[in-house]
């Protein structure tokens, strides 16, 4: 089998008064640094004009100290207003309405839920889903916001049915098959397997990944 070598490239940029370098191991990952809040987007999904996929960095927010500066986690001991402001800034940078965010508590399981406007975070940016690691929808303008540390992001779309999904795949979710569960949920909504496109987002590499004995 022929193996294609993908060259690693480096982008240098300045943010918050500091110099940074970003490394990529593929040609589909693009760092958007023209806005106040830098973010990643991906060529394969950019070609789908009906959807937008972006991935935050830790730059461009209001958080201090080790959380500097775009902390989007609610359980890091930071004041709620800072986290909300970071969400507002990020959504503004990608041209989206923060009130249409859909947020969930992720628990490393395989629950994938269909979401509609009833689950939107609203002006106060409230998390309305509990114990959900994957979301899917066919409603335009909803922002499915899933969170990752070193876990694997899985993004799905069906260009024909205009259905999207996003799943958080830690090692437990990966072993339990959350990717397969997400695809099955899309099929239940009428998607054909061959029409579903999947993108694996940025995550920790194998050489750096450590897990406990279980």
Where are these regions (language model features)?
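Active-site microenvironment for binding and transforming phosphate-containing groups
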Residues: 1-214
